[in-house]
Amino acid sequence: MKIHIIYQLKCRLIKAFKRIKSIHILIILFFSFVCWEILGFSTNILADFLWFQELNYLPVLINKLQTETWLWITTFLISMGFFLVNLRLASFFKYSKKQVRITERSEEIMLIPPVTIPSSKLRIEPSLSLSWLLCCIFGLILLVGLILTHYIDVFTNYLYPDLTVANVSPQIPSEFNIESICKILTSILSNLWLLGLFLLLSFAIIINPILWLSVFAVVLSLVFSFILSSHWANILQLLHGTPFNKSEDLFHIDISFYVFQLPVLELLRFWLIGLFLYGFVACILIYLLSGKSLSQGNFYQFSQQQEKHLHGLGGGFILTIAFSYFIACFELLYSRRGVVYGAGYTDIKVQLPAYVFLGILALLIAFFLFWQAIFSVKSIQSYIEASLWFLRLGRKRKRKKKVIAKLFANSYSLRAILTWYLIIAVIAGWLIPKIVQMAIVQPNEIEREIPYIKRSITFTKEAYIDVDKLEVELFDPNNELTYDDLINNKLIIENIRLWDTRPILQTNRQLQQIRPYYEFINADIDRYTFLKKESERTKNNLTKKQQVIIAARELNYESVPQPAQTWVNEHLVYTHGYGFTLSPINQVEKNGLPEYFVKNIGPDPTLEKNSTLEVLNRIRDSIPIGKPRIYYGELTNTNIMTSTAQRNKELDYPSGEANSYNTYDGSGGIVIGQGWQRWIFAKYLKDWKMLLTNEFIPETKLLYRRNINARVRSIAPFLRYDHDPYLVVADPNFGHKNMNQKNPNYLYWIIDAYTTTNHYPYSDPENNEFNYIRNSVKVVIDAYNGSVKFYVADPKDPIIRTWKKAFSDMFNSIEEMPTSLYTHIRYPLDLFQVQSEVLSTYHMDDPRVFYNREDLWRVPIEIYGAQQQKVKPYYLITQLPTETSEEFILLLPYTPASRNNLIAWLAARSDGENYGKLLLYQFPKQRLIYGIEQIEALINQDPEISQQISLWNRQGSKAIKGNLLVIPINESLIYVEPIYLEAEQNSLPTLRRVIVSYKNRVVMKPTLDEALQEVFQIQ
C-alpha cells in the first residue's frame, strides 16, 4: 500500500514538472539570479554603511553613493530610452515578409514600405547584389562586435579596482576610434575562439536581428551606466571646481577648465560616440536584413521612412563628431607631435584650424541631415542652387547638375556625405599637418618651436613643483675642511648613515622575528629627540636629535604553519602583530651587528617587570612604549573577530616557552553580536562559518579592511598614495586625561597622499600617469584602533580645495595635527623622486639650451653589493650652507648626462616652517667636483681596499658595498660608504669597514671615527 502511494505521488510530481515549460525554468532561474545579485548589492551597501559609520566618514559614503546613483540612473535611462525608441522605429519601418511580392512582368522583387504610398510613386531601382549585401551585413556585424568588445573591455577594467595601486580612481577611457579598432582586430586574429565568437554573433544577428540587437543595447546601456557612475569623482570636481587663477597661453582659459571640466567633456564624448554609433549601425542592420533580403539575394533601396530615420541617427552621430573636434582643440595642449609636450607650431598653425574647419563642417552636415530627417531638403533645393550659382558668379556648369540632383536625393545623400567627409577629415586632419611638420617645421625646428618650448618649461615646472618654494643657489665646495670642523658639526657626524634599511631588515628577520609568523616587511628612516647619555648631558642641553631606523613587527598569517591555518586561528587567534625595532643609523655593536634602542618581545628582567619590549632606559624616558599591538598595518590582510568566547583568546606575544594572550579593547571594529549583522557580513565576506560558530558573544566585534593601504583607498580613492607608509611612535594625547590608561597605544602610521591630474596643460608627464602633483594631504592611521585622519598639508592647492568643498567634514587643517605627530612628518620620497626626475631636464630655462639638451642631468650610478643601481634619495641630518642649524632633509646628487662629476644636488626640507621647501644647489661648471662613479673608481683602484675585499670574497664570505653618501659640511663635501660582510651560508650582514673619501684621499677603517681621523691625518 505504501509503495503504491509513493508511486502515485511520484507520477503526479513528474506530470507537474512536465507542465512546466523550459522557458518557465529559465525565467525562474533568471529571477533567482537577479534576486541573489540584488541581495549581494544590498549587503555590500549595508556593510559599507556600517564600516564608514564606524570611522565617522558616513557623509563621504552618502555623497559618493548619491552621485553614483544619479549618474547610473540618468545614463541608463537616456541610453536605454534612446536604443529602445530607435530599435522600435526600425522594427516599425522595416520591410515585413508579407510585403514581398514578385511582379509578373519584370520578375523583380519590389519592397513596399508599411506606410501606404500611391502606386504612381512606387519605383523599382537597382538593388544591392547578394555579394554587396553580404559585405555590408558582415561589415556592420563586425562593427557591432568591435563596439561591444571595446566598451565591455573598458567595463571589465573598472569592475574590480586594485586597492594596492597608488591611485584607485579610473582614468578617462579612450573613445572608440581607429586605434582601438586595430587593437581589437589584432586580438581577434590572434585568438581563434574570438573569431568563433564573432561568427556565432553573426549568425545570431542574421537569424533574429531585433532580438539580439536589443539584448546588446541593454548590455551597452548597463556598461555605459557602470562606467560613467565610476567617474563620480570627476562629476564632484566639476560641481565644486576651484579656479587655479592662472590661464594657459593659447585660449587664455583658466587651468581649472582643463583639470575639472575637460575630463567630463571627454567622458561625455566617450558615451555619445558609442550611443549614436551603435544605434545607427543597429538600425541599418535591421533594415538590410528585413524583407527576406538574404533569401531573395538582393536588397532594394531604403524606404522614405527608413531614410529619414537613418538621416536623423546619422545627423546625431555627425553632431557627436563635431563635439569631438571641439574637444580635440583643447586636447592639442597635450600634443606629443613637436619637440616638447603640448601644442607646437604645427598644432597651432595647422591642426587647430583644421579641427575648427572640420567641426563647423560637421555641424553643417548634421543640420543638413536633421533637415532631411524632419522635412525634405528638396523644399530648400532652389535656395541652395541659387546660392551655389551665385558663388560660381553666374557660370553654368551642366556637368555638376547631376551631382547636385543626386545630393538632394535621399537615397544618395547620406552615403555621399559620410564618404566625402571622411576623405576631407583624413586630408585636413592628418595628411596636411603631417606634411607641414616634416617639410616646414623639422628643417627649421628650433626657430619655429622656441615660444612653445618656453611654455612647456614654465608649465611643467609649475605643475610638479611649487616654484615659490624652490630656491636655486650656487654651491662652491672650495672650503678646506679640517677635523676641527667635524668636531664642531658633531650632530652631522653622529647622523651619517652607516646602516641602510636593507641590512637592517635582513638582521631583523634573522634575530628579531622571534616566531615564523612575525615579519618585518619594511623599515623606515625617521628622526627622534632622545635624552643624551648621562656623560653627554649638560644643564641646558639634555636632548639631541637622532636619525633612527624603525621597523614594525607585523603578523603575517600566510606564514603560520599550514596545519595550523584553521578558521579559528585565522579569525580569532592570530589577530595582530606586536612591537617594533628601533636602531640608530650609525652605531654598531662589537660583533658588527646593529645596535638596538628597542628590540625583542617579552618582559626584560633588567628593566621593568611589566615591560613587553627590551628598551634602553634613556629611550624609554624619551618616547612612549605602552603595549605596542598592531591590529592595522601593511600585512594585516585577514578579517578578525575580537571579544569572543574565552576559550579562544587572541595570541598577544610569545613569552618564554608559553604565549601571552589578550582581548582587544580598542574602539575599532563593528559589533556583530546581533543576528542581522552576522548575516550581512557573512554574505559580504562570503564566510558562512560566521553563522555557524559558537564563539560569538553580544560584544563580539568584526575588524576588516585592516590593511592600511586598502583602508585609506576605500575612504578616499580620489587621492594618490605614497608607496611607503611609515610607523611613528608618539603620544598625541600627551597632557590629556581621556586616554586609555589600561592599554595605551602609541603606534601610528603616516601615509603621504597626493592630488594629481593628467590634464594640466603643456606639462610633460614623462613616464608618469599624471602631469601635475602636490603633496596635499597627510594621513594618520591608529595602529591599534584603526581610526583614520586626513590633514591638509598644502591648503593652496586648488584640487584639495575642491575636495574640501565636496567633503567638508573629511579634511582637517595641518595645524590640528598633534605636535608629537607633526614633528615626524617628512618630505615624501615618491614626490621627491618625481620632482628630481623633472628637474634633471627642466632646470634648463633657456629654450635653445633645452632644445639642444646641452645641460641635461642624470641620477648617478652607485655599486650596491656587486650590482649597479641608480642612487636613491636619502634622508640625513645636516646643516645647509645657507642655514645656521642642522635639519632633517632629503638629498639627491646629480651628474651631467655624459660625464661622471657632480653638477648639482637637490635638497628637500622637512622640519618646522621650512617643510616643503626645495633647494637646488648647482656646482660651478668650470671646476671638477668628484661624482659618485668617480669616487667608486677611486675606491676600486685603492690597493689596500681592493685586496681586503678580494680576501673576504675568497673566505666563504661576501663583501657588500653599501650606499655611497655625499655629505655636505661647511661648504665642502665628504663621501662615506659602509662595507658589510655577509656569510654565503647566512644572510646576516655585519658592518666591518667604513670608507671615507675627501678630495682625492680614500681610506678604509673599522669605524667611522677612525676613518675620519685617517683621512684628515689626525694622529
UniProtKB/Swiss-Prot annotation:
Where does the chain cross the membrane? 23-43, 67-87, 128-148, 192-212, 213-233, 270-290, 313-333, 355-375, 416-436
Q: Which GO terms describe its cellular component?
A: extracellular region; plasma membrane
Provide the membrane topology annotation: Multi-pass membrane protein
Q: Does the record bear Metal-binding in its keywords?
A: no
Task: Fetch the InterPro entries from UniProt.
Answer: UPF0182 (IPR005372)
Subcellular location(s): the record lists: Cell membrane
This protein's UniProt keywords = Cell membrane, Membrane, Transmembrane, Transmembrane helix
Instruction: Write one Pfam family the protein is assigned to.
Output: UPF0182
Q: What is its main location?
A: membrane
Task: Name the protein family.
Answer: Belongs to the UPF0182 family.
The identity of this protein, by name, is UPF0182 protein Tery_0938
Task: Record the organism.
Answer: Trichodesmium erythraeum (strain IMS101)
